[in-house]
């Protein structure tokens, strides 16, 4: 799908209302050269943070959500190994869900991804990818976005949580049965493995 078509989809989902920018401004942010390209159009958190993007996700007619115990999602930034274009809208090339990295912990997966000449996705990138292709979120085939991490409150190092996107089972902590089957932005411990969560990555980024 061309970037112009992806921007149209985001406009249909309400990007103008979310950003307070009109269509002309958003087209200008992408740039004419990129509109005819392919890839995945990403909404930078400076334009719309992940917590506000998540409700645009849908599955089985249910909107996405951020787990209630992740109110600090906006404080998750980039790990040192990853750089993204400092523009409101940019493009990913070669996104992979990372199914072959299911049952790998984020700590184990990061060096493997880097050794392949790739980098992991951020949480905004993961949401942006699913907004364009919701079918990529499947039972037992979901993914972590380990490029987004939160610094520790005090001292060096990172908070032990890594964001992930999967499908809610309607647990009470998710808000109950009405959210069963909905897209869910949550977190996993960086040292834990999950048989149903891959580690998503990308070949390159551009603007």
Language model: regions and residue ranges:
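A binding-site-centric feature that preferentially detects glycan-recognition modules on secreted/surface proteins
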Residues: 1-119, 125-207
């Amino acid at each position: 799908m061309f970037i112009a078509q992806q921007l149209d989809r985001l406009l249909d989902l309400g990007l103008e209302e979310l950003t307070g920018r009109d269509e002309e401004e958003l087209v200008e942010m992408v740039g004419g050269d990129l509109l005819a390209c392919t890839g995945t159009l990403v909404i930078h958190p400076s334009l719309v943070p992940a917590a506000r993007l998540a409700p645009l996700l849908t599955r089985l007619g249910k909107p996405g959500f951020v787990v209630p115990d992740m109110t600090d999602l906006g404080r998750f930034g980039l790990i040192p190994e990853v750089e993204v274009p400092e523009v409101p809208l940019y493009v990913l090339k070669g996104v992979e869900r990372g199914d072959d990295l299911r049952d790998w912990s984020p700590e184990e997966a990061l060096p493997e991804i880097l050794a392949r000449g790739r980098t992991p996705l951020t949480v905004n990138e993961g949401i942006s990818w699913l907004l364009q292709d919701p079918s990529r979120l499947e039972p037992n085939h979901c993914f972590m976005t380990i490029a987004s991490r939160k610094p520790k409150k005090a001292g060096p190092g990172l908070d032990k949580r890594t964001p992930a996107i999967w499908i809610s089972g309607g647990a009470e902590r998710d808000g109950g049965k009405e959210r069963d089957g909905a897209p869910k932005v949550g977190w996993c411990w960086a040292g834990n493995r999950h048989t149903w969560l891959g580690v998503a990555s990308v070949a390159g980024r551009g603007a």
